[in-house]
């Protein structure tokens, strides 16, 4: 059975990915918005667009 040379060690993990993870771990100030808020904002925006289209005569 062939063995790996003694001088070679396992390759270390990529440093770039470690840097990205460290960047996201350092981020403390975040705007936290619940999924329900995003859904409600989308529905309100859609209804507002429909109402404005009907009011200004753009409704087919």
From Swiss-Prot:
Membrane side Cytoplasmic: residue ranges: 1-34
Subcellular location per the Swiss-Prot or TrEMBL entry: Cell membrane
InterPro entries from the UniProt entry: Preprot_translocase_SecG, SecG/Sec61-beta/Sbh
Biological process terms in GO annotation: protein transport
Primary location recorded for the protein, binned into one broad class: membrane
Membrane topology: Single-pass membrane protein
Pfam families: Sec61_beta
GO cellular component, one term: plasma membrane
Ranges in the topological domain labelled Extracellular: 55-60
Record's keyword terms, sorted: Cell membrane, Membrane, Protein transport, Translocation, Transmembrane, Transmembrane helix, Transport
UniProt xrefs under NCBIfam families: PRK01253.1
Entry's family note: Belongs to the SEC61-beta family.
Quaternary structure and partners: Component of the protein translocase complex. Heterotrimer consisting of alpha (SecY), beta (SecG) and gamma (SecE) subunits. Can form oligomers of the heterotrimer.
General function of this protein: Involved in protein export. The function of the beta subunit is unknown, but it may be involved in stabilization of the trimeric complex.
Protein name from the UniProt record: Preprotein translocase subunit SecG
Organism: Archaeoglobus fulgidus (strain ATCC 49558 / DSM 4304 / JCM 9628 / NBRC 100126 / VC-16)
């Amino acid at each position: 059975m062939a063995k790996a040379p003694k001088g070679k060690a396992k390759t270390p993990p990529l440093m770039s990915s470690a840097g990205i993870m460290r960047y996201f771990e350092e981020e403390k100030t975040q705007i936290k918005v619940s999924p329900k808020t995003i859904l409600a904002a989308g529905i309100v925006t859609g209804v507002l667009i429909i109402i404005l289209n009907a009011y200004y005569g753009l409704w087919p």
